[in-house]
């Protein structure tokens, strides 16, 4: 699979990435929130020992213990969508493993003992599901999962019971956000057992017009059914976004183009930038790239700036403590360097 951050596929507009997570627990062991720190570390060791005996995994996965990392390192992995807020919350006894391409992540002791994750670029649930299914099968041969004949996989949260599968697509919806139709969509898909959240999932806001669309219910539905249903809804939203963009360009052609190029100019010239400013300005430029208004910027550049200008990533790359203003100055420098050589 391709790392979504570094991909530059002209056909992949609107949908930045597809992700699937599986929640799994080990038989006979209390859920992570009931474990002592020492017991949680025992679970980490148990899982790692099992993984590193699997030939197909041991040479391609690197382990990270959150209790050995500084807080900024852990937050940096969150910003790259490789781990969750829940994992950081349990940092004293949690860990994760990632592959060399950063498309596979295995979180240990989040809400459940295991959260398996695969992520790739574009709307590509078929490939993502194939990858995570193979990973799950390999682990289940070496670890005994908590499973109930009627309920399916046992999870800490009842909404994950059954398949334990959560699929999500990260989508860029500037037109639907601008015309307020995103509110209608949110209300509509909630009734279909789906949800829309911000860039970093539950509890986060949709800065930069970036949303995560995911399923809410896993019990009583097959994996393929969940994925097919979600993919169908995402495709409908894509179509609505495209129609909204066409109407916007027809009615406000020069205003749209002005906003796009003005945003690019600010990104290239600003000396101080907040994280929210960058997300919103990048959204305008991304719209220009996706609509062919700007032709000399790769989407991979925008994706990397999206990640590298987040707070923890800046602090980690600078390798020193930064004041609020220093962070904003550093962010502007990163953006300027990322867009170096690109003409207005």
UniProtKB/Swiss-Prot annotation:
Residues covered by the Phosphagen kinase C-terminal domain: 14-244
Keywords: ATP-binding, Kinase, Nucleotide-binding, Transferase
GO cellular component, one term: extracellular space
Reaction(s) this enzyme catalyzes, per UniProt: L-arginyl-[protein] + ATP = N(omega)-phospho-L-arginyl-[protein] + ADP + H(+)
Highest rank taxon of the organism: Bacteria
Gene3D superfamilies the UniProt entry points to: Glutamine synthetase/guanido kinase, catalytic domain
Residue sites binding ATP per the record: 17-21, 81, 115, 166-170, 197-202
Database matches in Pfam families: ATP-gua_Ptrans (PF00217)
EC number(s) given by UniProt: 2.7.14.1
PROSITE patterns: PHOSPHAGEN_KINASE, PHOSPHAGEN_KINASE_C
Top enzyme category: transferase
Keyword Ribosomal protein: no
PANTHER family documented for this protein: ARGININE KINASE 1-RELATED, ARGININE OR CREATINE KINASE
Family to which this protein belongs: Belongs to the ATP:guanido phosphotransferase family.
Name under which the protein is recorded: Protein-arginine kinase
Native source organism of the sequence: Clostridium novyi (strain NT)
Gene name per UniProt: mcsB
């Amino acid at each position: 699979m391709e790392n979504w951050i570094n991909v530059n596929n002209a056909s992949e507009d609107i949908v930045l990435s597809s992700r699937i997570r599986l929640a799994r627990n080990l038989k006979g062991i209390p859920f992570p929130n009931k474990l002592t720190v020492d017991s949680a570390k025992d679970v980490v060791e148990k899982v790692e020992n099992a993984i590193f005996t699997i030939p197909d995994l041991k040479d391609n996965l690197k382990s990270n213990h959150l209790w050995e990392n500084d807080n900024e390192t852990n937050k940096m992995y969150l910003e790259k969508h490789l781990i969750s807020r829940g994992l950081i919350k349990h940092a004293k006894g949690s860990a994760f493993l990632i592959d060399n391409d950063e498309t596979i992540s295995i979180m240990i002791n989040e809400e459940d003992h295991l959260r398996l994750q695969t992520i790739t670029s574009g709307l590509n649930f078929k490939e993502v599901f194939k990858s995570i299914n193979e990973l799950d099968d390999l682990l289940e041969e070496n670890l005994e999962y908590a499973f109930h004949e009627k309920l399916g996989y046992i999870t800490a949260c009842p909404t994950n019971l059954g398949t334990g599968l959560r699929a999500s697509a990260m989508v860029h919806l500037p037109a639907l956000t601008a015309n307020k139709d995103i509110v209608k969509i949110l209300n509509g898909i909630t009734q279909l057992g789906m949800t829309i959240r911000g860039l970093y999932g539950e509890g986060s806001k949709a800065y930069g017009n970036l949303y995560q669309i995911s399923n809410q219910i896993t019990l009583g539905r097959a994996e393929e059914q969940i994925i097919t249903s979600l993919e169908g809804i995402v495709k409908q939203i894509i179509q609505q976004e495209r129609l909204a963009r066409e109407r916007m360009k027809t009615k406000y052609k020069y205003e749209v183009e002005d906003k796009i190029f003005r945003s690019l100019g600010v990104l290239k010239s600003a000396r101080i930038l907040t994280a929210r400013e960058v997300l919103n300005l990048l959204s305008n430029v991304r719209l220009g790239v996706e609509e062919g208004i700007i032709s000399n910027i790769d989407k991979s550049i925008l994706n990397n700036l999206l990640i590298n200008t987040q707070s923890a990533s800046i602090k980690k790359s600078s390798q020193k403590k930064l004041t609020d203003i220093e962070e904003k100055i550093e962010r502007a420098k990163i953006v300027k360097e990322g867009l170096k050589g690109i003409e207005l």
